[in-house]
């Protein structure tokens, strides 16, 4: 107590979103927490409890007594599956941005579903690129999902290659793409706050939806990342997540078919008022 501790992000955006949940616990013990994050996350992190100061990576750092990488905090707290701090939401969008999206969207007539079908290819990093090719879909592979007529679909996708897939597709009319207005993660979060459901591959936006407490359907690769565990369709990290796993590497058809069937049920339940709706 009485010390100033620097908590600094490492690895990707999704890792920062997942493990910033420990910041309030650190603040209870250390007193003053400085949180250093990637610049596109700074606005979003302003909604996180426990951080007295937030700085962008590369900026001069204030004085501190101790430091710890975010991804070392589960070890520092002796985390086990049953002790994961799983309460959500622990992040939110700035209220003025959420209100602006609400006004833009207008009246809700059908469930609003956000989509992310690809990650960052990171072509200069062979290992990361290989994993991205395993976790990502081509946009047209989502065609069965887009045929669920009683839903509105919104792109939460970033990246020129993935968006080109959308805009050259015969199904592009089924998806509203306002991604040019996503300047940082707080903008994406504000749109998600106005949606009912997010369907995403294993990307930072999946973590964002989970951290916001939004229903998340994760389309997950067969050789899964460690954090999603094995042989379960839920997540101890995100209570609102439902996992749809591949049966074999790069075999997406059966996964997408299961998502399509689940979405048909969801849209039917939403229509009669029994599906969870967005809070906004």
Regions found by a protein language model. Give the residues of each.
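Catalytic machinery of carbohydrate-active enzymes
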Residues: 1-280
